Amino acid sequence: MKVRASVRKMCEKCRTIRRKGRVMVICSNSKHKQRQG
């Protein structure tokens, strides 16, 4: 899980979602998991 100020899709399989007011990126590639904040 990467924590970044700006999250963006790293590949076409990445999906941006909101959980508990946080923007997150989920992907089949676990290296692409990101959270904002």
Swiss-Prot record:
Q: Which PROSITE patterns match?
A: RIBOSOMAL_L36 (PS00828)
Q: Which UniProt keywords apply?
A: Cyanelle, Plastid, Ribonucleoprotein, Ribosomal protein
Q: Could you mention a single GO BP entry for this protein?
A: translation
Compartments, as annotated in UniProt: Plastid, Cyanelle
- Where is it found, in Gene Ontology cellular component terms? cyanelle; ribonucleoprotein complex; ribosome
- Principal location class: plastid
Q: Name one GO molecular function term.
A: structural constituent of ribosome
Q: Which family does it belong to?
A: Belongs to the bacterial ribosomal protein bL36 family.
Q: What is this protein called?
A: Large ribosomal subunit protein bL36c
Biological source species: Cyanophora paradoxa
